[in-house]
Regions:
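Aromatic-lined carbohydrate-binding/catalytic grooves of carbohydrate-active enzymes
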Residues: 57, 61-168
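Alpha-helical scaffolding within the catalytic cores
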Residues: 21-31, 103-107, 138-146, 277, ...
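Active-site beta-loop-alpha junctions enriched in small/polar residues
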Residues: 46-48, 83-85, 125-129, 161-163, ...
């Protein structure tokens, strides 16, 4: 960890014994859009078709799903995974479909899919590029969310390839300035007006107004609080952070204004000048306001939480904006977090999305499917209505899985309250696969209105799962993992 101009004693203390974290990622309520209470049911292109998708394939798949009764069974989403998009954005910087494989554009495709009774879903990554190195959405959250909403997209999978984590370092702040939006002159508050917490310290610098700045706000270990920031009236104000330049590395800070967090990123800086300023627009109330400045990013998990929340709330704002602009009903977007379970999204996913991957990618290989089950089944307490553990898409009908293994795979996903996202070629599937994925009893268990994930009540060669259902009922599943017939008593 770099010192970042932290007071020498504080830096040594932090290295040797650590310091108490005084600024955590803000606690917020569950992410709610009203999109659906029960797990998603649909189809996705990735497991079978990978990067070989086009407009005709998607329309043929939707037609086959309707003809074979999958829409009636509940599979209402048709989702395009990676490689739907062009490698170049349009002249406005917006995402666009592949110019050759989706020549009609995405909005007309959405309209055709909707006309069949389905909803269309798309994919991007919480990074600079997608997993297949196409344009992604990190840093363009509001713009891309607006594009999705205007197209009428109703599901969005957000991967984690090419992610650039938020910096754990904070800038060196010597003052904040608050200016009523549209006005030239604002009120400056020198850092000496702030109350410091944790490792935050005043450091001397004769070249600055006020002769000092605050360091030690890094990695959640420090905080500075301005308790009496005055606003003449309630409204939008420009908050300017005046900083001392230091270090050739990015920095990050949250400005929490009356409990509402605003994020500010600071790029790697050249040192031609001693100081710099960075701004955001905040909401102030008439009279005195409180502004807290801190960097809560102490880990990759902290960074991921903030980045996924940013896209989640951009989607929520975009669908509302489009509905108001068109004077039409809102089409909320079901938001799928896909960071592969490495940063324990089951602990925070319900504040940032509707479903979250708990494992790396699935494969149509039986031992791998059992490993995914073994990890996901333990997380039963983290699933609730509108918020689900996602052990990845179904491989039923793919690879060389036997009928019994396909049935076991589907039944386990139903009991674990998992999203049921088909990954096979539904145009060509055999009748026995169709029989499995339209099993009404299992689908009813998955879609039960109580929305409880099954608990493994017995572990062994035969696992026993119990899933609470509405009306005081319980569904029980016996999963024979041994590979040989077992007598159950």
């Amino acid at each position: 960890m770099k010192r970042n101009n932290m007071c020498p004693f504080c830096y040594i203390r932090n290295l040797l014994v650590g310091a108490k974290k005084v600024a955590a990622v803000p606690e917020i309520e569950k992410y709610e859009t009203g999109v659906r209470r029960t797990p998603l049911m649909g189809w996705s292109s990735w497991n079978t078709f990978r990067n070989h998708i086009d407009e005709d394939l998607i329309l043929e798949t939707a037609e086959a799903m309707k003809e074979k009764g999958l829409l009636d069974a509940g599979y209402s989403y048709v989702n395009l995974d990676d490689c739907w998009q062009s490698n170049v954005r349009d002249e406005n910087g917006d995402l666009q479909g592949d110019l050759a494989t989706f020549p009609s554009g995405i909005k007309p495709l959405v309209e055709k899919i909707n006309a069949m009774g389905f909803k269309l879903g798309l994919y991007s990554s919480n990074g600079t590029l997608t997993c297949e190195d196409l344009p992604a959405s990190l840093g363009r959250e509001r713009q891309d969310a607006q594009t999705l909403a205007e197209w009428g997209v109703e599901y969005f999978k957000y991967d984690f390839c090419h992610n650039v984590p938020l910096s754990s370092y904070a800038p060196l702040i010597w003052a904040v300035t608050v200016t009523e939006k549209g006005e030239k002159q604002g009120q400056r508050y020198l850092c000496s007006n702030a109350v410091l917490e944790g490792l935050a310290r005043f450091m001397p610098d004769k070249g600055l107004e006020g002769k000092r700045y605050v360091s030690g706000l890094d990695a959640g270990k420090g905080k500075m609080v301005f308790k009496n920031v005055f606003a003449r009236k309630s409204g939008d104000y420009v908050l300017t952070l005046n900083i001392k330049k230091h270090g050739r590395y990015p920095k990050f800070v949250i400005a929490e204004v009356n409990g509402t967090p605003y994020e500010i990123n600071f790029p790697d800086q050249k040192h031609f000048q001693h100081t710099a300023r960075f701004q955001t627009v905040v909401r102030l109330e008439e009279g005195n306001n409180e502004i807290k400045l801190y960097n809560p990013v102490a880990s990759g998990k902290d960074s991921a939480i903030l980045q996924y929340r940013k896209m989640a709330y951009a989607l929520k704002a975009a669908t509302k904006n489009v509905a108001e602009k068109r004077n039409a009903p809102e089409k909320p977007i079901l938001f799928s977090i896909c960071e592969w379970g490495f940063r324990k999204p089951w602990l925070w996913g319900d504040t940032a999305g509707n479903m979250w991957r708990t494992t790396p990618d699935i494969r149509p290989i039986w031992p791998w499917i059992k490993l995914i089950y073994a990890r996901n089944v333990k997380l039963f307490e983290r699933s609730s209505a509108g918020h689900f553990n996602d052990p990845d898409m179904l491989e039923v009908g793919n690879g060389k899985l036997s009928y019994d293994r396909n049935m076991s795979h589907f039944a386990l996903w139903c009991f674990m309250n998992a999203p049921l996202v088909l990954g096979n070629d539904v145009r060509k599937m055999p009748d026995n696969v169709l029989e499995i994925i339209t099993n009404k009893s299992l689908i009813n268990i998955n879609q039960d209105e109580l929305c409880k994930q099954a608990k493994r009540v017995k572990k062994g060669r035969v696992d026993v799962l119990a899933k609470p259902l509405a009306g005081g009922r319980t569904a029980v599943l016996f999963f024979n993992k041994s590979g040989v017939k077992k007598k159950i008593s």
